[in-house]
């Protein structure tokens, strides 16, 4: 039997945590090399970002949720996990990303190089440094149900599932909407973000980034990318358009429509290449997965207490792919020496 092809899913803002994926650092060669490449590309800031990621500093948890740390590290970890999969000799049939995860998908599909991605991440961090305090709110309701309840600059920031919507906007306005929703018995919880991602609030702050994207040699994807910006496959024209990427932080994430299209086009094994297993939880609700035509395999644990769980989860995922009929190569091992990691996660 021909095995179901794999598709890689990359999570975005809200999934981050200190030491995400760190159990593969110093253990998997491709993952380690990619993370080190990112830290090198970050220049003088790289060592500090690395230490914050590994929990070697006294960085408060809430500061890790800020764009300055969360976005570059989510991008780095996603690219590192994707390259670790490619290093096993496994070619994905499709890529899909949520928020910053779409930049990861574009990088692995060859739309842009890792070095350009890191530079653009630095540009995004700088552009959003002076943005007003923002918030995001996960709500157990459809976007249509929520539309009449939105106030001021609060908008739908993401459609994650038919009844799983993310709202975004200025922090005080989001809080008022949260109080109204809770008073009406609608389940909601704050997402881990200090910026109003995927709302027009950020438009003035990212307006100038089209110039930075324009300096990058953007290319058509060499692998199929299902764009959560479009809710559809990424076209060559969109991939090469600097304005498409510059505007991404201000536009809603249509993750469920994009996932729905992917799973309508083909039956796959969805590998979540990032922390938290949030996209895995969403994807398991899709009829194609619930009915067994497609499957979901996370590469990292949901809430690790020890860094060794990262390697255990990655190894279990590889074994699952073998059971599916794939023939992954032996994982590249880092020569003994290098990295001393703290044992426990927060």
Q: What do these predicted regions represent?
A:
Residues 47-48, 179, 216, 325-346:
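Flexible, low-complexity inter-domain linkers and amphipathic docking helices that mediate domain-domain
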Residues 138, 186-272, 281, 307-315, ...:
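Acyltransferase
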Residues 143, 169-174:
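Helix N-cap motif at beta-to-alpha junctions
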Residues 149-152, 174-185:
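Short amphipathic alpha-helices in soluble, non-transmembrane regions
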Residues 163-169:
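A generic structural motif
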Residues 290-300:
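Short hydrophobic/aromatic-enriched beta-strand-loop microsegments
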């Amino acid at each position: 039997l021909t095995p179901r092809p794999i598709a890689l899913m990359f999570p975005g803002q809200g999934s981050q945590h200190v030491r995400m994926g760190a159990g593969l650092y110093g253990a998997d060669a491709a993952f380690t090399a990619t993370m080190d490449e990112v830290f090198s590309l970050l220049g003088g800031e790289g060592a500090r970002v690395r230490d914050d990621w590994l929990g070697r500093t006294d960085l408060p948890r809430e500061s890790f949720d800020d764009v300055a740390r969360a976005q570059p590290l989510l991008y780095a970890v996603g690219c590192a996990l994707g390259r670790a999969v490619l290093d096993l000799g496994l070619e994905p049939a499709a890529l899909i990303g949520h928020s910053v995860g779409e930049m990861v998908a574009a990088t692995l599909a060859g739309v842009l190089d890792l070095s350009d991605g890191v530079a653009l991440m630095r540009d995004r961090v700088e552009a959003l440094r002076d943005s007003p305090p923002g918030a995001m709110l996960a709500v157990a309701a459809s976007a249509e149900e929520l539309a009449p309840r939105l106030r001021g600059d609060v908008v739908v920031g993401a459609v994650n599932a038919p009844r799983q919507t993310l709202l975004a906007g200025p922090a005080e306005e989001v809080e008022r909407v949260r109080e109204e929703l809770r008073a009406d018995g609608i389940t909601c919880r704050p997402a881990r973000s200090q910026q109003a991602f995927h709302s027009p609030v950020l438009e003035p702050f990212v307006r100038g980034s089209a110039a930075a994207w324009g300096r990058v040699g953007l290319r058509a994807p060499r692998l199929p990318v299902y764009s959560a910006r479009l809710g559809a496959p990424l076209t060559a024209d969109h991939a090469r358009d600097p304005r498409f990427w510059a505007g991404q932080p201000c536009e809603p994430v249509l993750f469920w429509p994009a996932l729905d299209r992917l799973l309508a086009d083909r039956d796959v094994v969805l590998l979540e290449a990032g922390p938290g297993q949030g996209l895995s939880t969403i994807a398991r609700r899709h009829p194609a997965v619930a009915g067994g035509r497609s499957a979901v395999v996370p590469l990292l644990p949901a809430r690790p207490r020890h860094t060794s769980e990262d390697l255990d989860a990655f190894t279990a995922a590889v074994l699952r792919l073998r059971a599916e009929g794939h023939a992954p190569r032996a994982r590249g091992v880092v020569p003994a020496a290098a990295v001393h990691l703290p044992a426990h996660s927060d």
